[in-house]
Amino acid sequence: WLGDQDEDHFGDDLLDHFEQYEKAAKHKSELAKRGTSYVGLDKFYEDARNGNLPEVSYIVAPENLSEHPPFKPMDGSWIQKKVADAVMEGKAWDSTAIIYSYDETGGWADHVMAPHPPRSEKGEWIEDPFLKFKGVQPIGPGYRLPFYIVSPWTRGGNVFTEHAAHESQIMFLER
């Protein structure tokens, strides 16, 4: 596995916050080389075209291509197309799946409000000790997170409607 990113991932690569990666970075270990080094996206494009990608690669887009305000969906679609083109033109396309995933926990990508229980439901509302300024919040399923898969095995026009979360994608990769 390898994480491909530029230095400007604006805090979106959460591996930086795990102790084992902090220690690995200090010692320039194999873990740091794979998870938190900044080899740049040009290296990913080259490896994709030459069929030299590891079994799992993940990309953290730079801030200006993240679609976070003030940037636009057009900015994010540019890098998504560039990644897809590199992989689809590569020697390993016939055995590859690309998962595009968003990190939107604020619901900005969705037009449907997250379901939550009535305020009177006991045990379903808590005050987060770390975010007390937000007041009492519901617990349970959160906002829907958009993601899609591009692969020679997928068929267009289908929508996956089962409950899933970011860890669902990791579990899929581990199979």
Regions inferred by a protein language model and the residue ranges of each:
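N-terminal pro-sequences and low-complexity stem/linker regions of secreted or lumenal proteins
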Residues: 1-175
